[in-house]
Amino acid sequence: MAKKLLLGDEAIALGAIHAGLSGVYAYPGTPSTEITEFIQGNAIARERGLHSRWSTNEKTAMEAALGMSFMGKRALVCMKHVGLNVCADPFVNSGMTGVNGGVVVLVADDPSMHSSQDEQDSRFYGKFALIPTFEPSNQQEAYDMMEVAYAYSERIKLPVLMRVTTRMAHSRAVVEVKDEPSQENTLNYDAIAANWVLLPANARKRNDFVTAQQAQLEEDAVSSQYNKYVEGTDKKLGILASGIGYNYVMECFPTGSPYTILKVSQYPLPKQFVRRLMDECQEVLIVEEGQPFIEDMVRGVGDPKNVHGKLDGTLPRTGELNPDIVKKALGMESGECFDPCADVAPRPPALCQGCGHRDVYTALNEVLKEFNNPRVFGDIGCYTLGFLPPFRAIHSCVDMGASITMAKGAADAGQWPAVAIIGDSTFTHSGMTGLLDAINENADITVIISDNLTTGMTGGQDSAGTNKFEAICRGLGLSDEHLKVVVPLPKNMPEITQIIRDEINYHGTSVIIPRRECMQTLQRHLKQKKAAEKK
């Protein structure tokens, strides 16, 4: 066994490769992005020709993974928590179809919303879809679980959801890894068509089958190597800890816990262990990262007055946990903390100097001064920072692709002018259908597709629509007369402002594409070019 220092994301990626992975499908989103990037750069993955291209969105990623599974091979789907909303349709239905080759759906939740718009807990999706969920407590488990999850997926013929959180994904630890990776599955034709064609007659049978499996899945959770019941000597308190929450608990007891601890890293919740904990201990503390998912269920098993956690305020309901927070919940004193930020001047996030989005907002703000009550609907990406000073340019940002459809809805309500601003990667992710709606109804909106030739905010991944946006807009039915392309530079400001002014005054759907490469990827490409010239 070799030892490697790995991020949680890297441990997951390497675990998948060593488990005989044939393809990863993903849309970049913090904190899950590094999984796919690691696979793309891994020597074994390259040698084997593993599929590792970015997908257009999470839904297409999930469906492609199901196609690979249909042919008997092992697939990995990666996304951040809100991406699971996007692929909910195929994800939930994958519980009905089942799998042929193993499928692991890796979802990275973001408590404290470091780079997200909500704190949703993906474990609810696993329960809703009736599929098992794994939640590693450390990087070693994250690596080891991948092989276990694929074997389990193929044994029970269901996909497996694996849930991690930001701190697990982006912290490093030494991980023992296998010397030799497992071989990939061979192509096979064992998939039963009746399971995969979800006509009502077939789906009813599959629904009965999956529902009947739940008792076995719970038995498997009780016998899982990742769920442990460690009896303590002090029965005043029992602790149920899940995922990384277990690590935080153990940090509070470096020489061992006097209390009984139930560690949960595989779901459905092992109720047999929970009942034992409730029977043996006077009080129970639930330590879980995210929503009170387990706590809600445990309160239905015993006297809720004896259950403590997020619902009674023992632990904070929002934000990340950490060892100090858990110590406080246990009534223990935590050491004094050094505040590294006490003397540091605040530096809020801002668009990079030289960024093309800056020039777009400068021009847009200049033009919108000429109108009464303009509204600008923003989207997810670097350009969302246009909400902050000095631009203060956008009035909404809800979810991927919402800018165009919200602008259309506002125009339907009588708002004018209604402007949508969306990035290139977000447009192909989920903006095209909204533009089609607008074009079909000739909605009175102006759409700005701010194209920086990359998926910038998550690190400069390839953008699916690069060099295709004009063709896409024409294909959706937009006329060339109201499809404009500009280069966002200060020297072009008179031209850009006039085009924005003209298209706002046109009463119909128009699209403006300001196109200039992201400054970060431009600098990276220049460095690569210089390095290549020196060779």
Residue ranges and their predicted role:
Residues 35-38, 64-66, 87-91, 113-120, ...:
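Short acidic, glycine/serine/threonine-rich loops at helix termini
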Residues 40-45, 250-261, 471-480:
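Short helix-loop-beta junction
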Residues 1-9, 19, 136-351, 356-357, ...:
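Flexible, low-complexity linker and terminal segments
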Residues 1-139, 167, 232, 258, 387-511, 517-532, ...:
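Thiamine diphosphate
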